[in-house]
From Swiss-Prot:
It comes from Bordetella avium (strain 197N). HAMAP family: Ser_tRNA_synth_type1 (MF_00176). GO terms for biological process: selenocysteine biosynthetic process; seryl-tRNA aminoacylation. The keyword Cytoplasm applies. This is Serine--tRNA ligase. It is found in: Cytoplasm. Consists of two distinct domains, a catalytic core and a N-terminal extension that is involved in tRNA binding. Belongs to the class-II aminoacyl-tRNA synthetase family. Type-1 seryl-tRNA synthetase subfamily. Disulfide bonds: none annotated. It catalyses: tRNA(Ser) + L-serine + ATP = L-seryl-tRNA(Ser) + AMP + diphosphate + H(+); tRNA(Sec) + L-serine + ATP = L-seryl-tRNA(Sec) + AMP + diphosphate + H(+). PROSITE patterns: AA_TRNA_LIGASE_II. Gene3D superfamilies: Bira Bifunctional Protein, Domain 2, Serine-tRNA synthetase, tRNA binding domain.
Length: 449
């Protein structure tokens, strides 16, 4: 959520920065709600001051033995008036929050202005061998097959997945399933053993409050899988009168960014423990509501996929150093696997909802003769923290400040599997195992039918 103080002080700057993302801000509604909020708040504060003054006056009159009945009568009328004003103020504040909950983050000054992925900027690329004439990885020396054609003889089974679950799911068996697991284990070991992340195991189902905090709700509700619970409620909530309350909605996670980042929700952490570095390997569930007919073949865009996520909770003064560090942590996975990649700085129009600055890592897929995203690393600054009320205290005497939250894929396991299959394919249909993965594969050097 955007800083309300910034909106009140410099609304036009906020509007201009949002326009660079292709987003219009409803200034008329904001100004209307804000002016009404100020008016009610002024009236509330005046009534509170009057209540305090009357209480003092009553005390003075009683101390002198004088009649305080008239003042007490006025004082007794105030609670009802004050309650109405406080309810009006709470309603207006809720409407303001609802407006701001659907507004994306402001782009950092270093983010290039643009409308789409065509305006993203390549920062660097890494190739394990000499480039071809066009600057991309050199051709394999034979007609490359895509990961579906390579994988099906080796244990990648889309027909069984479709029978079990429908389109956009995968079923793996044997060596293919082991290679998929090996990739995830390798990524976790690298992030925890060398990059200082703490491995976490998180729930795959979260409540709506958690999703509001990280920004998936309310804007991206259609992208989530809603969970319908059967049977009775094993943890019924009741109000002050003992009446049952409605159960909070629950959803499958679309990324473990949600659960890892939310560890600090409604928390004030000591400044000396920052940065917090967390990682988790989880399945991710996405409805792909807006994907249309894109990437219907294979594993590129699925309803369920695995990902090793990296999250850092940082001091605002160090968050952009942390962003560059996290990009390097994702890059190291690709380097160790020997996969060609490039780093792209996303433009304002291509960034995610909560991001202030994002780098995408794109891996080379020979069969498509193109680069495809395999990791996205973002600094959300205080955007999520403000929604979650996640703060830190620099020292015992300091006021709490909002932390900065960062997240990134380290990496998407399924897409890494695709990249390994396509880049390490051999003309005879076998696939060489990258050296970094061989310890996880029992020393196997290649997959073959």
């Amino acid at each position: 959520m955007l800083d309300p103080i910034l909106l009140r002080k410099d609304l036009q700057t906020v509007v201009d920065r949002l326009q660079s993302r292709g987003v219009s801000f409803d200034t008329e509604r904001f100004n209307d709600l804000e002016s009404r909020r100020k008016l009610v708040q002024t009236e509330t504060e005046a009534l509170q001051a009057r209540r305090n003054a009357l209480a003092k006056q009553i005390g003075q009159l009683k101390a002198k033995g004088e009649d305080a009945s008239a003042v007490m009568a006025e004082s007794q009328a105030l609670p009802g008036q004050l309650k109405q004003l406080e309810e009006s103020l709470a309603m207006l504040q809720q409407q303001l929050n609802e407006l701001l909950m659907s507004v994306p983050n402001l782009p950092h000054a270093s983010v290039p202005v643009g409308a789409s992925s065509d305006d993203n900027v390549e920062v660097r690329r890494w190739l394990p061998a000499e480039a071809g004439a066009d600057g991309n990885p050199a051709p394999l020396g034979f007609a490359p097959r895509d990961h579906v054609a390579i994988g099906e003889p080796l244990g990648l089974d889309f027909d069984t997945a479709a029978k079990l679950s429908g389109a956009r799911f995968s079923f793996m068996r044997g060596q293919m399933a082991r290679l998929h697991r090996a990739l995830a284990q390798f990524m976790l070991d690298l992030q925890t053993g060398e990059h200082g992340y703490t491995e976490c195991y998180t729930p795959y189902i979260v409540n709506s409050s958690t999703l509001y905090g990280t920004g998936q709700l309310p804007k991206f509700k259609d992208d989530m899988f809603f969970v319908t619970k059967g049977g009775g409620d094993d943890d019924p909530k009741v109000d002050e009168q003992g009446k049952p309350l409605a159960r909070e909605d629950q959803y499958l996670i679309s990324t473990s960014e949600i659960t890892l980042t939310s560890v600090v929700r409604d928390t004030i952490v000591p400044g000396d423990v920052l940065p917090l570095r967390m990682t988790a390997h989880t399945p991710c569930f996405r409805s792909e509501a807006g994907s249309g007919g894109r990437d219907t073949r294979g594993m590129i865009r699925q309803h369920q996929f695995d990902k090793v996520e990296m999250v850092q909770v940082a001091n605002p003064e160090q968050s952009y150093d942390a962003l560059e560090q996290m990009v390097g942590h994702a890059e190291e996975v690709l380097r160790r696997l020997g996969l060609p990649y490039r780093v792209m700085l996303l433009c304002t129009g291509d960034m995610g909802f909560g991001a202030a600055k994002t780098y995408d890592l794109e891996v080379w897929l020979p069969a498509q003769n193109t680069w495809r995203e395999i990791s996205s690393v973002s600094n959300c600054e205080s955007f999520q923290a403000r929604r979650m009320q996640a703060r830190f205290r620099a020292d015992a005497k300091s006021k709490p400040e909002f932390v900065h939250t960062l997240n990134g894929s380290g990496l998407a396991v399924g897409r890494a599997l695709v990249a390994v299959l396509e880049n390490y394919q051999q003309e005879d249909g076998s696939v060489r195992i990258p050296e970094a993965l061989r310890p996880y594969m029992g020393g196997i050097e290649q997959l073959k039918a």
